[in-house]
Amino acid sequence: FTGTWCAMCPAGMTRLNYLISSSYEGIVYLMSFHVDGTSADPMTIEQSSILSRKFAISGYPSCVVDMRGTMGLSENYSVMRAIFNESLEKYPAHCGVAISSVYNEVDSEAKVTVKVTSEKTADYRLVLYVVENGLKYQQNDGGNYRDYTHNHVVRKLLSASVEGDKLGQIAEDKEEVKEYTVALDDTWKAENLSFYALVMDENGYVNNLAVCEAINGNADYEYVND
């Protein structure tokens, strides 16, 4: 959770990016939910406020891991790693997720297909977001505003709610497929967009996810039960 008005957010983002790139590349994916604060943030969406209230976010920047554990971004790296590792080790994925996008440039539209296969019979929900890189806005950085490039910005929720769309009960080793037709907003740059598919378990936590680029992106199943 961040904001253009937040003086400590650039430093927090630098720390989080370093931690992910050094220890969790391809495992942890970052989403930036912008909220209004002492001034309005041009990248704010309604769901940012809904989620910040849900997780009782009181300080910025803050991070929520798998819609479960919260942490500040000024924590010691060992503390941050412990929170990531707990989510990975204590709550392992029991489903695989694949996502693909077929982009129609003429209509500025993408057909997104999400596939979920479960290794056990369980109930799931699917949350799908549009995320954009390369947005340039003024940012408060340590008390001084400067030009700043914002990445991983959540632009739109494509599911019915932040709780996700019901996939129902998926039987062991069976696959469920859900498709979305996404009209791209005129203010978005298609080449900078990705779709994030978060598959939630029966407790409302992220069990697994997949990410693909908006322009004909494809991310096949990666999780394999050993």
Language model regions located:
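Local sequence-structure signature of Cys/Sec-based thiol-disulfide redox active-site neighborhoods
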Residues: 1-35
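Short, conserved sequence motifs used for protein processing/export or organelle targeting and
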Residues: 26-226
